[in-house]
Swiss-Prot record:
It is a multi-pass membrane protein. The gene is TIP4-4. The chain crosses the membrane at residues 20-40, 53-73, 105-125, 143-163, 168-188, 216-236. It is found in: Vacuole membrane. It comes from Zea mays (Maize). Keywords: Membrane, Repeat, Transmembrane, Transmembrane helix, Transport, Vacuole. A motif (NPA 2) lies at residues 197-199. GO terms for molecular function: water channel activity. One of its GO terms (cellular component) is membrane. SUPFAM superfamilies: Aquaporin-like. The lineage of its organism: Eukaryota, Viridiplantae, Streptophyta, Embryophyta, Tracheophyta. The keyword Cell membrane does not apply. This is Aquaporin TIP4-4. It comes from the Eukaryota. A motif (NPA 1) lies at residues 83-85. Belongs to the MIP/aquaporin (TC 1.A.8) family. TIP (TC 1.A.8.10) subfamily.
């Protein structure tokens, strides 16, 4: 069941909130700069044709590393969301107010746009900023489903390895979240582009002026993210610890 907390406009004047919003802007800027930059670099090295197994692997690795580092860097300041789907996935269970969520999303979109503007300036002689696009033969509804499933897995991992106080991974949560992102890029990249992040798609689309099927990269993640939060919070968060396996000398 959703547990939305509305919040209040006074949050905007709170020093902690201001720092958190600024952190989201900077973290998202750095994430998108590395993520989109890696796609541009693979395309440049491949002579404009970066859609290869090697190119996909390189982009997946770049996203794995930058997500792990940026989430870790921002965890103690803003939560290290860098993604509107993560923000709304946490808002759905009352872990962040809707007012602060709106500030986070605005900062994430601005950070993404600034990163892409800088990349476009740096790569002025090349083909421009790449945008997410559906693969050949993949319709919009299939794209939405793919993005929803990929984002569901991302948010499920966020809850299990970062949010859940019973997590057994210590400080490895951000790394594990990064690994899920990388795996999802490998799995979904050829089909939907594996965005999982409306901000990651918004900046390139705005700077490039290409909006074909852009709605897919909002609808899919914003279905999958909150749904994962509600499922994990409702089924697993409130439950007690798991039953330990019986030892060899234990009678059944």
């Amino acid at each position: 069941m959703a547990k939305f907390a509305l919040g209040h406009h006074r949050e905007a004047s709170d020093a902690g909130c201001v720092r958190a919003v600024l952190a989201e802007l900077i973290l998202t800027f750095l994430f998108v700069f590395a993520g989109v930059g890696s796609a541009m670099a693979t395309g440049k090295l491949a002579g404009g044709g970066g859609d290869t197994v090697v190119g996909l692997t390189a982009v997946a690795l770049a996203h794995t590393l930058v997500v792990a580092v940026m989430v870790s860097a921002g965890l103690h300041v803003s939560g290290g969301h860098i993604n509107p789907a993560v923000t709304l996935g946490l808002a759905a269970t009352g872990r962040i107010t809707l007012f602060r969520s709106a500030l986070y999303v605005a900062a994430q979109l601005l950070g993404s746009t600034l990163a892409c503007l800088l990349l476009a300036f740096l790569a002025v002689a090349d083909s421009g900023v790449p945008v997410h696009a559906l693969g050949a033969g993949v319709g919009a509804l299939r794209g939405v489903l793919m993005e929803a499933v990929l984002t569901f897995s991302l948010l499920f991992a966020v809850y299990a390895t970062v949010v859940d106080p019973r997590r057994a991974v210590g400080g490895m949560g951000p790394l594990l979240v990064g690994l899920v992102v990388g795996a999802n890029v490998l799995a979904g990249g050829p089909f939907s582009g594996a965005s999982m992040n409306p901000a990651r798609s918004f900046g390139p689309a705005l700077v490039a002026g290409v909006w074909a099927d852009h709605w897919v990269y909002w609808v899919g993640p914003l279905i999958g993210g909150p749904l994962a939060g509600l499922v994990y919070d409702g089924l697993f968060m409130a439950q007690g610890g798991h039953e330990p396996l019986p030892r060899d000398d234990t009678d059944f």
